[in-house]
From Swiss-Prot:
One of its GO terms (molecular function) is urease activity. Its EC number is 3.5.1.5. Belongs to the urease gamma subunit family. Pathway: Nitrogen metabolism; urea degradation; CO(2) and NH(3) from urea (urease route): step 1/1. Keywords: Cytoplasm, Hydrolase. It catalyses: urea + 2 H2O + H(+) = hydrogencarbonate + 2 NH4(+). Pfam families: Urease_gamma. Heterotrimer of UreA (gamma), UreB (beta) and UreC (alpha) subunits. Three heterotrimers associate to form the active enzyme. It is an enzyme of class 3 (hydrolase). CDD domains: Urease_gamma. InterPro entries: Urease_gamma, Urease_gamma/gamma-beta_su, Urease_gamma_sf, Urease_subunit. This is Urease subunit gamma.
Length: 100
């Protein structure tokens, strides 16, 4: 199977998000990379489902809460930027202060 670098990045992100979901299900708190992966994957999947950029910016703030991440992670994570593919092209989605 031949994958482009972009496709490899998306698969790596999905794998990290899957790991984060499993850790959350076991009651563990997420670290910084796991939180970013989970939020990013939610944005990518939302774009695939046909949601708008504005909807995804809002959705990104609802993925995980402060109680689900390790101490200090919300303060370190100010923005998450994801380049998502929409029916009309690729757009940069920025989620401001994703962990509230």
């Amino acid at each position: 199977m031949e994958l482009t670098p972009r496709e490899k990045d998306k698969l790596l992100l999905f794998t990290a998000a899957l790991l984060a979901e499993r850790r959350l299900a076991r009651g563990l708190k997420l670290n910084y990379p796991e939180a970013v992966a989970l939020i990013s994957a939610a944005v990518l999947e939302g774009a695939r489902d046909g949601r708008t950029v504005a909807e995804l910016m809002s959705l990104g703030r609802e993925v995980i809460g402060r109680e689900q991440v390790m101490d200090g992670v919300p303060e370190m994570l100010h923005d998450v930027q994801v380049e998502a593919t929409f029916p009309d092209g690729t757009k940069l989605v920025t989620v401001h202060d994703p962990i509230v």
